Amino acid sequence: MIIKGIGGFYYVEAANQVYECKARGIFRKTGITPYVGDRVAISVEENDTCAIEEILPRKNYLIRPPVSNIDQLILVVSVCDPAPNPLIIDKTIAVAEDKGIEPIIVVSKTDLQGYGELEEIYTKAGIPFYAVSSATGAGVKQIQDLLPGKITAFTGNSGVGKSSLLNRIDPRLSLETGEISQKLGRGRHTTRQVELLKLEGGGYAADTPGFSSIDLERGERIKKENLPFCFREFEPYLGVCKFPSCSHTCEKGCAVLEAVKAENIHPSRHESYCAMYEEVKDIKEWQMK
């Protein structure tokens, strides 16, 4: 499995060793780029040079950041400094749902401020929700228990405490952490490349660049017809609207809108859905390529 890629070299873990490999030219010719997380077949020559010969089928992948075969995505959200942005949270969850990746929300810095509203929104949506404080260690054991045997991508905006959380999960990692800029109110980008980190308790963590620039019109695109299925709390109401072509944004007889009125779906989540629908509704099939 590729655990890191940098400068045209790919570092492949196999049989408890790490091999520095180059990708065969055939991959460039066919437009295939090896991703961190790819399971690959490699060859080892007599002079110890190694090459990636084959990339095995991926169960999923992200384009930005380039990482594949993810089991779960832990989205770290801070209660303050920086404040949570529901639309960015919901876009990230939707991308995970569309790719078949289990989304998990971890709220950080809970020693500084309450998080009741966030908890209400996402527990109502059926999204696994955890609260931690990297400063005190509260809640970290629960996150550690989620990781063995899985590839977990850790993501979130700059400054939310991803690296601090990973350092708490496995102190051997000693990841650089970024202090919040007092002037900008944002953290320095301390994660410069995607790398799979082998965890002491089992499993791998992908510490990925922040998702602050995620855009459904570029990179991780979701088809208009798939978007409702990326909001798992919509599922009981899909297919029962008055009109088969219902967009679930404003139509009369929409079961999703009725569920929002009945407080079975949180208004914040529906607002995010409507904003995302506006972004994708006019994208043509050929633009998805």
Protein language model annotation of sequence segments:
Residues 109-160:
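Canonical P-loop GTPase G-domain recognition
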Residues 18-24:
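A short macromolecule-binding patch
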Residues 162-178:
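A conserved segment at the C-terminal end of the G1
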Residues 25, 31-48, 56-73, 78, ...:
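Helix-rich effector regions associated with P-loop NTPase G domains
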Residues 77-86:
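Short, glycine-rich nucleotide/cofactor-binding loops
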Residues 1-6:
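Structural detector for short beta-strands of small beta-barrel domains
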Residues 8-12:
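Short aromatic-glycine-enriched beta-strand elements
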